[in-house]
Amino acid sequence: MPEGPEIRRAADNLEAAIKGKPLTDVWFAFAQLKPYESQLTGQLVTRIETRGKALLTHFSNGLTLYSHNQLYGVWRVIDTGEIPQTTRILRVRLQTADKTILLYSASDIEMLTAEQLTTHPFLQRVGPDVLDARLTPEEVKARLLSPRFRNRQFSGLLLDQAFLAGLGNYLRVEILWQVGLTGQHKAKDLNEAQLNALSHALLDIPRLSYTTRGQADENKHHGALFRFKVFHRDGEVCERCGGIIEKTTLSSRPFYWCPHCQK
């Protein structure tokens, strides 16, 4: 499943295609959304927001389209009039004069008013988004030490969207490698230096992935361009200590780590 950085980049692509342009045609597959087709035609997409792995498409009339891709959903941008070659099932089409965005295969799609946004179950449950520039390491540290999260092992905590939205398995693996910790640790057991390092890494690595992942420069490291240090690198040499990276399973997900330098 895509993680926060990939979802945010997808939102950026959608915004670049249709933001601020009048919608010339709107189509929804689900019957409960059909009444909104006429209400949205002629309106503008004002912004596309991410909350972890959910997308919120905000319209100029105050409505917001909530969508969660889950495992199978995918957005596409096409030229208006183009007929995509795909076997996927179309769920949403938002069309402007020159560009059209399409949502395929997703099933978790709703139209929300401003009031409903504040009471939506997923949006109420999800924690602060790691890509929200307003979120600080100090706030992350406070969440780590809060009664709700301080006794949770990192193996599960770093996959819990209620803790921090936008984290996922590759980020969990890379963050814990960066700070030299295993997934069995809990925040309550860390010293001050470890807490500070983890609080920064929980923001720095997702943000680095968002801004630079996919740019090719294998000589760069965290702090310059993002690339995997341990994820999918089992059997390879750890660049930090020379140990051999191993693969196991934690919280029912593949976990990659270096037993020599992650303690």
UniProtKB/Swiss-Prot annotation:
Active-site residues, record numbering mapped to chain: P2 (schiff-base intermediate with dna), E3 (proton donor), K53 (proton donor), R253 (proton donor)
UniProt GO MF annotations: class I DNA-(apurinic or apyrimidinic site) endonuclease activity; damaged DNA binding; oxidized pyrimidine nucleobase lesion DNA N-glycosylase activity; zinc ion binding
Residues binding DNA, per UniProt: Q70, R125, N169
FPG-type zinc finger span: 229-263
Disulphide connectivity of cysteines: none
Cofactor(s) essential for the protein: Zn(2+)
Name of protein: Endonuclease 8
Gene that encodes it: nei
